[in-house]
A protein has these predicted regions:
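Short capping segments at the starts of secondary-structure elements
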Residues: 21-28
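DNA-recognition alpha helix
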Residues: 28-41
Length: 146
């Protein structure tokens, strides 16, 4: 994080956990907390939440929230993409979609606003749920994330 303020040890650990998961991974605060506890047993849940909030403020990680959803997910900064929230199993997956710049420019001009980013989240069924095999629902019920 060149040019960024020095972070407390615990925040660095949180950042490492999110970045180590790589692009395409989406972890909840609970997932990150569990991994942090493996490496630093004394770390508290509130510390993880404060660290996630600060890292998002700095742009070191990204937060994805689903309206009316129960959780937020965190991911490393990545090239522009969208997400699909599976309404059956609750999984969040990356999808290859970027809002067309022409559409964003037209919207900004029409509404007299400046658009900094387009964050797109689709709702529907992920590939396994759309195929109807139920594997994702069973896997997630057993507490296993991708």
């Amino acid at each position: 994080m060149n040019g960024q303020p020095r972070l407390p040890r615990n925040y660095e650990l949180i950042r490492e956990i999110v970045l180590a998961a790589g692009c395409g991974s989406h972890q909840t605060a609970g997932d990150i907390f569990a991994k942090a506890r493996e490496r630093r047993p004394a770390i508290g849940y509130a510390t993880v939440h404060r660290g996630l909030a600060r890292l998002c403020e700095l742009g070191a990680i990204l937060k994805i929230e689903i309206p009316s959803g129960d959780a937020a997910w965190y991911e490393p900064p990545a090239p522009a993409h969208a997400h699909l929230f599976c309404t059956r199993c609750g999984e969040l997956v990356d999808v290859d979609y970027v809002a067309p710049q022409q559409t964003l420019r037209a919207l900004a001009q029409r509404e007299a606003v400046r658009i900094a980013a387009a964050i797109v989240t689709f709702r529907g069924l992920c590939r396994p749920c759309a195929a109807g095999d139920g594997a994702n629902v069973e896997r997630l019920a057993a507490g296993k994330r991708r």
